Structures are given as structure tokens and as C-alpha cells.
């Protein structure tokens, strides 16, 4: 055990005390108005620089920037040879930037309101970027793919936005398993849910490059599945566990996939909390801290969208957020 892992684990536990957790998230989500929700957010680590008139987009950006800062702090404490760990956990934010850039490229033939383009400003990743901001200079979807292929992401495959983003999500799963082995079953379960969404909700064919990456994560038998139930039967146990909730639900299985998504979040949260509470100082502990930071951010984003809108039954919000 090196001093770097001890320092990063200790610092990580202190950062977790800055998250707002389920109760704080629920309070923002059930605020009577967006102004009330924004005021609550401003009193947390996510809103220290949030303008008093900020809209939801600005609030999401502020929350994301806060989490990036936390990951950068942790990266500074890691052993020099392990800097890729923080970069891997920052990948969802980089994916968000890439997807927004692809959307703008798709609309390049249309009139794009200047103020809208300004509001879509990408998240600054600093040293945590893998291919960003270079990809942001691409002027076509093919150029995006080419630039990604020359980066640590590798070629995601596909020729349109949906295919490229799918390829990157699967590639992120493989990066996670390499950098943070404790995430292996989390990644396998989440990947299986992703396959189910693509195949049986969106009805999309998964291109071969992404399919080969999927084979590495959940085995090749998913390829012959013709229904969600068939898919679950063909998955290894290490990947099929999120679907226990779906099987127990009434109604069509593919309409209950949100329960499987929730099962992934619950499992990751519970496992990661246990790891951070063991008192051990290790790569696994730091990985668990980073996972919990991402989950808290995701839940805060959900709360921002819910604040001041039609009330959602508590049990539904708890599941989705």
C-alpha cells in the first residue's frame, strides 16, 4: 500500500461528506417551485457559484463542474502511475460533451440560435479529458470518429450519433473494469441492461465493433437473444442480476427495464458504501468513492429536472433518481 492510496482514500471519504444524498435530493426534487429548488441547491457544494436566476441547464452544469473538481482533487492525490483512474470516472462527462457536439454537427445545416449554442457550452474537463477538447474541433461526424480512434477511446464504430455513443458507452465499461476491477460485476450488469434497451426498447441493431466489446463484457450468447426473457437466460449470472426486479414485475418485461436500471444503482451504491466504510485505503476504496460521487451527481440532475414540476410519487422518484 502506497502513501498515495492512503491519501486519496482519506481525501475521498471527506469529499463524500459534501454529497447531499437521498434526503437532500428528495428535498430539491419535491420543491414547490424551481426557485425553491434552486435555493436549496445553492446551499450545497453543487451550487456555491450558482447565479440566483440560474435556469435548470445552468444548475446541471454547475453540479457537473463541482463533481469534475472533486475528481480532479482526488486525481492529485493518486500515485502518479494511476492517474488514468480519475480520467476513467470522468468519462461520462466527456461522453456528454461528445454527444452534444454530435448533436450540433447533425444540426449544422439548420439555423442554430446563437444563444442556444452558448447554453450548450461543454463541460471543462481539464486534465481529466481523454479526447476532449480535441474532438470538439471536429467538423463532421466522421471526423469525430477518426479523432476518437486516435485516442485512448479507440474507434467506437458506427456512422451516426446513436451508434458512436453506444460504442463509447461499451468502451467505457471495458475501461472501468481495467482501471477499477471492483466494478466488474457492476459493469456487467449495467452493460446487460444497455443491451436490453438497445435491442428490445429502441429496436436498434448493435454494430459489430460494439458487439465485439460486448462479447468481452457479457459473453457472446446475447447475440442470439430474440426477447428480453431470452436474453436474461443467455447471460452469465454476473450480468443477469439486474433483471431479477424485472422478472418480478407485472406487465411486459421490456417496459420494466427502469427497475433493472434502478437495481444497478442500488447495487453500486450499497457495494461502494461498504467499501468506503471498511477503513481500507486502496484502489478499490478510491474507485468506490468516485462511483458514489457520480451517483450523487446523477441523482442531483434528476432532482433539478423534477423541482417545481408535477409531483412524482415518492417511490417512483426513489427508483428513478
Q: How would you label these PLM feature ranges?
A:
Residues 1-321:
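N-terminal domain-start signal
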Amino acid at each position: 500500500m502506497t502513501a498515495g492510496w492512503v491519501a486519496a482514500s482519506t481525501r475521498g471519504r471527506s469529499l463524500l461528506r459534501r454529497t447531499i444524498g437521498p434526503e437532500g435530493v428528495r428535498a430539491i426534487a419535491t420543491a414547490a417551485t424551481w426557485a425553491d429548488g434552486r435555493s436549496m441547491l445553492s446551499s450545497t457544494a453543487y451550487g456555491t457559484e450558482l447565479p440566483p436566476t440560474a435556469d435548470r441547464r445552468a444548475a446541471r452544469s454547475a453540479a457537473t463542474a463541482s463533481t469534475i473538481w472533486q475528481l480532479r482533487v482526488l486525481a492529485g492525490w493518486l500515485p502518479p502511475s494511476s492517474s488514468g483512474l480519475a480520467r476513467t470516472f470522468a468519462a461520462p462527462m466527456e461522453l456528454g460533451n461528445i454527444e452534444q457536439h454530435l448533436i450540433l454537427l447533425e444540426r449544422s445545416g439548420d439555423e442554430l440560435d446563437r444563444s442556444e449554442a452558448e447554453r450548450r457550452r461543454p463541460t471543462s474537463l481539464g486534465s481529466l479529458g481523454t479526447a476532449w477538447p480535441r474532438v470538439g474541433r471536429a467538423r463532421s461526424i466522421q471526423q469525430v470518429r477518426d479523432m476518437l480512434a486516435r485516442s485512448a477511446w479507440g474507434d467506437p464504430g458506427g456512422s451516426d450519433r446513436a451508434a458512436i455513443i453506444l460504442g463509447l458507452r461499451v468502451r467505457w465499461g471495458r475501461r472501468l473494469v481495467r482501471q477499477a476491477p471492483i466494478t466488474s460485476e457492476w459493469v456487467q450488469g449495467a452493460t446487460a441492461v444497455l443491451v436490453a434497451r438497445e435491442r428490445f426498447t429502441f429496436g436498434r441493431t448493435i454494430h459489430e465493433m460494439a458487439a465485439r466489446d460486448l462479447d468481452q463484457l457479457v459473453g457472446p450468447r446475447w447475440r442470439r437473444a430474440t426477447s428480453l426473457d431470452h436474453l436474461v437466460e443467455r447471460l452469465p449470472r454476473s450480468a443477469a442480476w439486474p433483471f431479477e426486479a424485472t422478472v418480478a414485475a407485472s406487465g411486459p418485461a421490456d417496459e420494466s427495464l427502469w427497475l433493472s436500471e434502478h437495481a444497478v444503482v442500488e447495487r453500486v451504491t450499497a457495494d461502494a458504501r461498504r467499501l468506503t466504510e471498511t477503513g481500507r485505503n486502496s484502489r478499490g476504496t478510491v474507485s468506490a468513492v468516485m462511483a458514489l460521487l457520480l451517483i450523487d451527481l446523477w441523482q442531483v440532475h434528476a432532482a433539478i429536472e423534477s423541482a417545481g414540476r408535477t409531483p412524482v410519487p415518492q417511490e417512483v422518484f426513489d427508483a428513478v433518481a
